[in-house]
Amino acid sequence: MKKIIALFTTLLLMGWSLDAAAFTCKVNDTGQTMTSGSANVYVNLTPSVGVGQNLVVDLSSSVSCKNDSSGGSIIDYINLTSGSAFGGALAAFTGSVYWAGNTYPLPMNGNSSVYTITHTDYRGLPLRMYLTATGAAGGVVINSGELIAQLNMHKVASDGNPNNFIWNIYANNNVVVPTGGCDVSARDVTVTLPDYPSSMAVPVTVHCAQNQNLGYYLSGTTVDAANSIFSNTASSSAAQGIGVQMTRYGSVVPANNTVALGTVGTSPVNLGLTATYARTSGQVTAGNVQSIIGVTFVYQ
């Protein structure tokens, strides 16, 4: 009789233990499962500009969770908690997190609303992160493997059993996250000029999340009084007496002079720039020519 009682006691304890751990999350990319604790989540960033905010990452396809109770009889209540914030190169930025139909400021100073989970299959968390747009068409470089955010999550079930999760979000690719209300087609453009005295169009466009009156100006080291010829910075076998000049529809564009683009919306607008050689002082000698020219966008 004592053996039978001991067997029943073991079965009852096992049953209680299974009910208590009635919630599991999974990192979809690695397959790692967990009932509490922290995990590193590597995501491919494909940011895009929006009205007043720019999407950084949609985590709904990266982290999935499910209810482990029989038929979802025990209800799991999930919410994000204080301390969730951007990290790494994005740490200085503010933004927002979308969670289950509501949006909260980042960094979070309080807890979010509760998301109820009764489904017993893995489903993505309704979770997206945004940067607050500042300026025109700026951006911040994110390197592969760099931490971009930490999200804190709390779970409690209808029968108790609270647990905490920490999602450390890392970039899985090199990308420039737009920080302004507009974005450009490329942020590092190499224009290869044919032999002197040729020219080449600069393939750069800009678009905005909503109509903006936009302009831009060029910057770099110039060698003439008009600030229109950019210096040759070639490090080896540099040509002499030659620099690079930028024109727009046939007119020279000096450095630090704002060029008005007019209204720019969701359709890309070409900057209309062409790179060409320009004579400086002294005798022209053959060699390499290289100039580094910045483009800064401004609202007008």
Descriptions of predicted regions:
Residues I4-M14:
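Sec-dependent N-terminal signal peptides
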Residues G15-D19:
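N-terminal signal peptide c-region/cleavage motif recognized by signal peptidases
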Residues A21-Q300:
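Mature extracellular/passenger domains of Gram-negative fimbrial/pilin and adhesin proteins
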